[in-house]
Amino acid sequence: MPGNSFGKIFRITTFGESHGPAVGVVVDGVPAGLRLSQEDLEFELSFRRPGRLYVSGRREKDVPEILSGVYNGRTTGSPIAIVVKNTDVISSFYEEVKVKPRPGHADLPFIMRYGYENWDYRGGGRSSARETVGRVAAGAIAKKLLMFHDTWIAGRLKSLGPVDSPPADFLQILCSKYSPVRASDPETEAKFQELVKQATVEGDSYGGVAEIVVKNPPAGLGEPVFDKIKADLAKAILSIPAVTGFEYGLGFQASRMKGSEANDSIVRKGERLGWRENKSGGILGGITTGEDIVVRCSFKPTSSIRKPQGTVDLRTGEPAEISVLGRHDPAVAIRGVSVAESMVALTLVDHSLRSGVIPPVKLEERQAEVIEDRWRRYMEECRPTAESQS
């Protein structure tokens, strides 16, 4: 099964299945000298961890173990292997799935591709969102390394089902980590919570849209024509389980506008040139402009639901119904925000290393100190959130 790696210089390879012994990631291309601890990884993993209100009831502690690539609290430049054990697995929930593939899920395509006898049906196996633990762990390293340029990444759940959020500034989006449903304001949070409760009672689920904003990104990232930053961001985001769409800046809204409406005036901003409204979402010509990068992605409703759905019994070939048991997110988009943040970070740090914005081989001591100071400031901004979700 190829296709488990992402990136060129900062390259990750995730491994593991939903109900296997563990999941994890190998991260290659991290410069030597970056200060890195288990706490750094746990901090980011806490925001996607299940077992909390409004998300999956699967109670995983998600404690990362760094196996290689770090010595005396600093990266050595060699591959960093991280493993997270699966500790709350109940495979008996999936006995019916073994003979009745779930509508909307990857069950039947995996059978078609790899053969029924090779299919790990337990919790979705490799197609499960449990795989994203490795992405978020690697994303923590990427986010920290981006502090070299004082680049911050934050995300929120912009919409859930029929409920949309009002516009929000970066601080509001950053503080959405306080929200159990990743909402950026109290009124929207209450509406999101009501929808999730409703879906849970009905045995159903909702889709949503995540919005990710990158503050102070380096200008000049992206390599036309086939390695445009927008193309790599799209690939990164669309690789996330349950994601069905991607846009940046005005996105699909631009298709309904005139050029005079969609174009953004170039203006002087202090000692540099910039754009008045950042309608392009920080990307033009496939290259970052230095303005905030704004991307959005849509998540479909969670496929595994209790409400009966039509399928086929693989034993008989006859029509059948399935009501999926187990512990599933009523809205996978809630925890998907953290995964989307991580994929944006992984894309940007890879391009930063490729372009030389970040030293690709080693960090000087002063550079490592500055990164650490900025990272601690970021963690303190979000600290109440991490504690409230533990």
Swiss-Prot record:
GO BP term, pick one: amino acid biosynthetic process
Residue numbers binding NADP(+): 48
SUPFAM superfamilies found in the cross-reference section: Chorismate synthase, AroC (SSF103263)
A single cellular component GO annotation: cytosol
Annotated binding of FMN, by residue: 126-128, 285, 300-304, 327
Catalytic activity: 5-O-(1-carboxyvinyl)-3-phosphoshikimate = chorismate + phosphate
Role of this protein: This reaction introduces a second double bond into the aromatic ring system.
GO molecular function, one term: chorismate synthase activity
Keyword NADP: yes
Protein name: Chorismate synthase
Binding note for cofactor: Reduced FMN (FMNH(2)).
EC number: 4.2.3.5
Family, as annotated: Belongs to the chorismate synthase family.
Needed co-factor(s): FMNH2
One matching Pfam family: Chorismate_synt
Pathway: Metabolic intermediate biosynthesis; chorismate biosynthesis; chorismate from D-erythrose 4-phosphate and phosphoenolpyruvate: step 7/7
UniProt entry keywords in alphabetical sequence: Amino-acid biosynthesis, Aromatic amino acid biosynthesis, FAD, Flavoprotein, FMN, Lyase, NADP
Gene3D superfamilies the record matches: Chorismate synthase AroC (3.60.150.10)
Top-level taxon of origin: Archaea
Organism whose genome encodes this protein: Metallosphaera sedula (strain ATCC 51363 / DSM 5348 / JCM 9185 / NBRC 15509 / TH2)
InterPro entries associated with the record: Chorismate_synth, Chorismate_synth_AroC_sf, Chorismate_synthase_CS
